[in-house]
Regions:
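Glycine-rich phosphate/pyrophosphate-handling loop used in enzymes and phosphotransfer proteins
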Residues: 1-230
């Protein structure tokens, strides 16, 4: 892949003498530096500890205060990037238009973040997609595209509801009223396991909290999450 996936410019790859002596495999870039810089990283030092939203200082945002008032323990989501216009364009091309090449843009970074939890003994549970989306529209789970060869557990499946309105087509109020969309299909007892939920975007948190509830009901000791964007 010699051209940037986003702008089409020729990709340059500088190899230092130290790199050659390291005998490490050559990681080929898929986007140019100019395009990569357009995506705004979230600074964990000044993000909401509940959802990962970028804040001016480390404090709980109003959305997360609402979850606490509703009786939920915060999921402590970590998000890598802001969900701004450039990220929306990326998600549209990858997730909704089904350009599977776009998984490479964030795959390495996403896998490194998830691997941090895996090394701490967390079971990795991706948020599933419904069968209709998988078979008729996209043909892949966008989260699994980023995760690559990382071992995952299929503890959750999407309840089949033909013609249901997808989350991406709902406004905030409709999202918050969404009923439990998942079924738990894992072990009879999760035996105090630590679980890392993995999803693409944290919007209202409704999807992740639904998943968290099922896993806790099945015996999970602790459930947290990582998303690409917030």
């Amino acid at each position: 892949m010699n051209e940037c996936l986003l702008c089409g410019r020729k990709l340059k790859q500088d190899m230092t003498f130290d790199f050659l002596l390291s005998f490490k495999p050559l990681a080929r870039p898929v986007v140019c530096e100019n395009c990569q810089k357009k995506f705004k990283r979230i600074d964990f030092k000044t993000s909401c500890p509940g959802c990962g939203r970028q804040m001016s200082k480390k404090t709980i945002c109003e959305d997360c205060k609402g979850w606490e008032k509703a009786g939920y323990k915060l999921i402590l989501n970590q998000a890598l990037y802001k969900y701004d216009e450039i990220m929306k364009a990326y998600v549209t091309r990858y997730k909704f238009m089904g350009d599977y090449r776009y998984r490479f843009i964030f795959a390495d970074e996403f896998q490194k973040k998830v691997a941090e939890f895996q090394k701490q003994g967390y079971a990795i549970v991706p948020i599933p997609v419904d069968r209709e989306t998988f078979e008729k529209t996209r043909g892949f789970n966008q989260v699994l595209g980023w995760l690559g060869k990382i071992d995952c557990e299929n503890y959750l499946v999407m309840r089949q509801n033909k013609g249901r309105l997808k989350q991406s087509h709902k406004d905030r109020a409709m999202r918050m009223k969404t009923k439990q969309p998942f079924e738990y299909v894992g072990p009879n007892n999760l035996s105090d396991k630590k679980i890392l939920l993995v999803d693409d975007i944290y919007t209202t948190g409704r999807t992740l909290y639904h998943a968290k509830t099922l896993l806790e009901d099945a015996g999970a000791k602790f459930v947290t999450s990582v998303t690409l964007a917030r």
